[in-house]
Design a protein with these regions (language model features):
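Cytosolic regulatory regions of ion transport systems
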Residues: 1-188
Length: 188
């Protein structure tokens, strides 16, 4: 009888990455390392060739917003489409085409600050699973550090309405081993 592995095997996902610049390249590298089945789409023949040789992934040269290109990349079998080209509009259109023509999740990188107030509307109306603005996310993380400089970790819940702060406490502070009710009594 063979011993069962303590680690649960994660199902390999079929992922299409549109745009193989720095972010697309890094995503490809990480997701291949995790054992996922990756297809990249880029307009540059050189980028497609270099990336497919480096990571042993499938590559398609073309415009990721084209339904024909997405179908050639395996859209019908894809679990996830990630669009990280240099164009916000292309990323959104790519995800819209994928969402409307297949049953897969979609992630679009959108960097233009003009869209920040419209992200929820865009996500809900277009059916995009996730929209990521890396610059906005970075700015928010920096603000958290500035707001709570002594926190060693800050977790955010409820769409940013709740923050859980992790602090390192010293024995002389008198907080160690106390319940929240006991601490609340000390603060009144």
């Amino acid at each position: 009888m063979q011993a069962k592995s303590a680690r649960k095997k994660v199902r390999s996902l079929r992922i299409i990455i549109v745009g193989c610049g720095k972010v697309g390249h890094t995503l490809t590298e990480q997701l291949v390392r995790e054992g996922h089945d990756i297809t990249i789409v880029d307009t540059s023949e050189r980028v497609v060739r270099d990336t497919t040789e480096m990571f042993d992934v499938m590559g398609i040269r073309g415009n990721g917003a084209s339904l024909n290109v997405l179908m050639e990349a395996g859209l019908q079998e894809a679990d996830l489409v990630i669009a990280v080209t240099g164009s916000d509009e292309l990323n959104l259109l790519c995800c819209l085409m994928a969402k409307k023509n297949a049953k897969c999740h979609t992630i679009a990188r959108v960097r233009n600050p003009l869209y920040n107030k419209e992200i929820r509307f865009i996500r809900e109306q277009l059916g995009i699973s996730m929209i990521i603005n890396p610059e906005l996310t970075t700015a928010r993380e920096i603000l958290k550090v500035l707001k709570f400089p002594s926190a060693i970790k800050i977790d955010t819940f409820a769409k940013g309405r709740v923050e859980l702060l992790h602090f390192r406490i010293k024995p002389e502070m008198g907080f160690d081993g106390k319940t929240i009710m006991e601490l609340m009594g000390r603060l009144k």
